[in-house]
Amino acid sequence: MDNYAFMLAQQWINKIPAETALPLQQQLDKLPNDKISSLGFLPLKDPVIGLVLGLFLGHFGADRFYKGDIGLGILKIILGVLGIVFFIVFFAVGASMSNSINGDSHFLVAFFLGLLALLAPSIWVIADWFFVWKGIKRDNFKKITEYLSMLGARDLRETR
């Protein structure tokens, strides 16, 4: 394997799906050096950045915006805001009903409904830790294969 092709494959190893690394290295071996050198400037996204964004700003859709899924990022923002609004509304309604007979039980029911509305979008946020991680790697591999096909290499997508 050419030294530059090997370095390039090692640079991409954590940015593409694991099952595609070997076929990609084999394809890079077949390319001439002048074509391989242009691959070094291919902008790939880092799945670790997507994960960190999901961990800290997942309710605001930052991981989806980073991945390029703008529509899903906006939907995550809307659901997160709705969860907060419903929590505040249920909490306020429960607090106002706490002065009536059986008020404490009404407050608890309203509080737990509000808490449920606040935590429901969290299920999607947690699932997105995995979906965005895998999706970024798939998108990177797709970008590499499209660029390789522009360079005249055989299509690697059939190896998956």
Range-by-range predicted roles:
Residues 1-51, 77-160:
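Transmembrane helix recognition focused on a "late"/terminal membrane span
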Residues 52-65:
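A short amphipathic helical element positioned immediately N-terminal to and/or at the very start
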Residues 73-75:
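Short loop/turn motifs that initiate or flank beta-strands
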